[in-house]
Amino acid sequence: PTGPGDTINIQGVYTDGATRYNISELAGGWAGANTVFGGTSLPGAYQSVGFGFAPDSVFAVGTQQQLIQTWGMRGAYTHNWDAYWNTAIYGAYAGVRYNGTAKSYICGPTGSGVGGSFGAAFGTAGLTSCNPDYNIAQLGLITRWTPVKNLTFSADVTYVHLDQKYAGTITTSSGSIGKPSATYELKDQDTVQMLFRA
């Protein structure tokens, strides 16, 4: 059931070399970079990590830019309880795809990480799959209270799932990911955040 002023919004998007129009709000950070840490049950691993990078393009010295393709959709339903309160449920799902040449710049010519930028940064000894493609999903609920005009308080809970395609382990130096020098398991990550705004 809907009430006066309720809204339903749905959007779909496809980009080719314009990733920020799709991914930046989902992944956040520089160039849509999403690096998420979590727990692990892998013996010898310090933590787990998931990578989702979404630049507009990638290139190597002396080569052409390889455009990154993305697709996605998002939607929301807002219900107005009365003139002061409303609640919205929202969600989004997006995919980031690198072409074969772009993948070779990152994962090397054989896709093993050897000879690519990922292997150079994180090593390849424990890497079992090198693939920069990923999907990201988001589901959230926000409630807003507007006691007077131009003043709104809100509480927003968001769940995000990063479905990344790297597998195996990496061993890092402390500066490369801002964590202790250790072994990290590569795997999908889930996060929940709550924001209070005024």
Identify the role of each PLM range.
Residues N80, P132, T146, K187-Q189:
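Surface-exposed coil/turn segments at beta-strand junctions on protein surfaces, enriched
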Residues P1-L139:
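Detector for outer-membrane/organellar transmembrane beta-barrel domains
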Residues Y21, P147-L151, K187:
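Outer-membrane beta-barrel biogenesis signature
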Residues P1-T2, T78-Y84, R144-N150, V160, ...:
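Structural signature of outer-membrane beta-barrel channels/translocons
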Residues G140-T143, K149, S154, V192:
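Mobile, glycine-rich extracellular loop/lid and propeptide segments
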Residues N150, S154-I177:
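C-terminal beta-signal and adjacent terminal beta-strands/loops
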Residues D188-A198:
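Outer-membrane beta-barrel "beta-signal"
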Residues A120-L127, S173-Y184:
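Flexible, solvent-exposed loop segments that connect beta-strands
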